[in-house]
C-alpha cells in the first residue's frame, strides 16, 4: 500500500466497481481477472470488503468454481488481459479459451446478476493476436 506496480496505481476495474457500489446500483460484485499478472492492486483495494470477491484466473476449472460460489453477486466485472495467450507472454490460453471465458461470464451474469457484467481492457502485448482474442471474448459475451 506504500508503493505501486504501474497498472495498479490507476486501477480501472476497482474505480468502476467502487463507483457502482457507491451509486447503489450493485452491492455484491465478483471480479474475474484474466490478465497474466496478478491484480495485487485490485486484491488489496477490496481485501477487507466481503461484498467484493476477486479471482485471478489460473485455469478454466478454477473460474467455474469461483463463479459457482458467487451466485449471490449483482455484477461480474472482468479485468480483461490477453497476455495469457499461447502467442503472448503467458503461453497458456488459446483464442477459443477467451470465447469460453466470455460465455461462462455471460451465462453466470444472465442467471444470477440480471445480465449485468462488463469488462475493461488490461494487458496484451502481441498485437498480431490481441485483436482476435478481444473479439473472441466479446463473441463469448454475446448470448444471442
Describe these PLM feature segments.
Residues 1-144:
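A general "terminal functional-core" signal
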